[in-house]
């Protein structure tokens, strides 16, 4: 089963589930998180679920709210939700879309979360991070430099031409990681 949790939802997350955080631009960016989630759910439902592993559930954590509430404390709750979900994730993904926004908060979050994954999963952290850039993203070079510096080795940022193609590449990489991680035995 694939479940999508959207901010600010809080649900019990089964320890055996593979948890994936969909980080990346939200404001002035396409709704790529929903495209990824919908494609993964469709792919999972179209295939034999055993292709994804042996009964391991998948939880996609989407920080994009259906609608933003302009009320006191909304930003605080959003950021707390994101920190909580990122701390629980097994796979961290970040997508940088082309368009109006430079996504400066995402640039900060990228380095911070590479470090977090290195500390949480010291033996296999590189197999738990997916980073993709639309070639139209204004700061592609900054993303590549930051990931190289944060990881002490080439992490492998995918830079793909075109919004649809880059989202498809991000989907394929996440799907590949999920097929690997849902097959791993529970520890």
Residue ranges and their predicted role:
Residues 1-187:
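Conserved catalytic or regulatory cores that recognize and/or transform ribose-phosphate-containing ligands
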């Amino acid at each position: 089963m694939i479940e999508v949790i959207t901010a600010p939802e809080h649900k019990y997350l089964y320890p055996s589930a593979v948890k994936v955080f969909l980080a990346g631009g939200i404001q002035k960016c396409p709704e790529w998180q929903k495209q990824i989630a919908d494609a993964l759910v469709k792919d999972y439902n179209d295939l034999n679920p055993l292709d994804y592993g042996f009964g391991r559930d998948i939880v996609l954590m989407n920080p994009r709210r259906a609608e933003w509430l302009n009320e006191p404390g909304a930003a605080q709750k959003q950021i707390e939700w994101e920190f909580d979900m990122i701390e629980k994730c097994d796979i961290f993904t970040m997508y940088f879309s082309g368009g109006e926004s430079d996504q400066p908060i995402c640039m900060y979050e990228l380095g911070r979360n590479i470090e977090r994954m290195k500390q949480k999963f010291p033996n296999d952290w590189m197999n738990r991070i997916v980073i993709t850039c639309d070639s139209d993203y204004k700061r592609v070079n900054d993303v590549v430099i930051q990931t190289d510096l944060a990881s002490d080795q080439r992490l492998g940022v995918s830079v793909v031409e075109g919004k649809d193609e880059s989202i498809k590449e991000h989907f394929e990489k996440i799907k590949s990681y999920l097929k690997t991680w849902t097959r791993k035995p529970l520890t």
